[in-house]
């Protein structure tokens, strides 16, 4: 592998309906087996359901949901001497978004509604109101980091 230069991150094309890069990224997180059009249908239907229930703009609710799910710290395993410590570390902005989207989708998949669009809509509504499984996941990660604050000096 050549060591000459660092390859920059690729620009993602905005989604066709709302022209949002964030939404395009979210579509890619939802997508399974390369079925992008199915993922787009799920997201757009979920956004319509959300806009119906709350009289706000589609993307503002998604933004609010992701803001409430984004973690600021996480723990990473670090082996020191013969024991492994859970060391709290700050999360980079790109990873924050990625984790928030992943947790939102995972929480939606575990819900009980009939279609994935309804599950996703429900989870987005819950997350925008600071409740739901995805927000609980973020709280757990923050609690874990708080509990292991004593090992923060092992940070790298």
Swiss-Prot record:
An annotated GO BP: translation
PROSITE patterns linked: RIBOSOMAL_S7 (PS00052)
Ribonucleoprotein in keyword set: yes
Keyword Membrane: no
Keywords assigned: Ribonucleoprotein, Ribosomal protein, RNA-binding, rRNA-binding, tRNA-binding
GO molecular function, one term: rRNA binding
GO CC terms in record: small ribosomal subunit
One matching Pfam family: Ribosomal_S7
Gene3D superfamilies per UniProt: Ribosomal protein S7 domain (1.10.455.10)
Subunit structure: Part of the 30S ribosomal subunit. Contacts proteins S9 and S11.
Function: One of the primary rRNA binding proteins, it binds directly to 16S rRNA where it nucleates assembly of the head domain of the 30S subunit. Is located at the subunit interface close to the decoding center, probably blocks exit of the E-site tRNA.
Protein family: Belongs to the universal ribosomal protein uS7 family.
Protein's recorded name: Small ribosomal subunit protein uS7
Species of origin: Shewanella denitrificans (strain OS217 / ATCC BAA-1090 / DSM 15013)
Gene field: rpsG
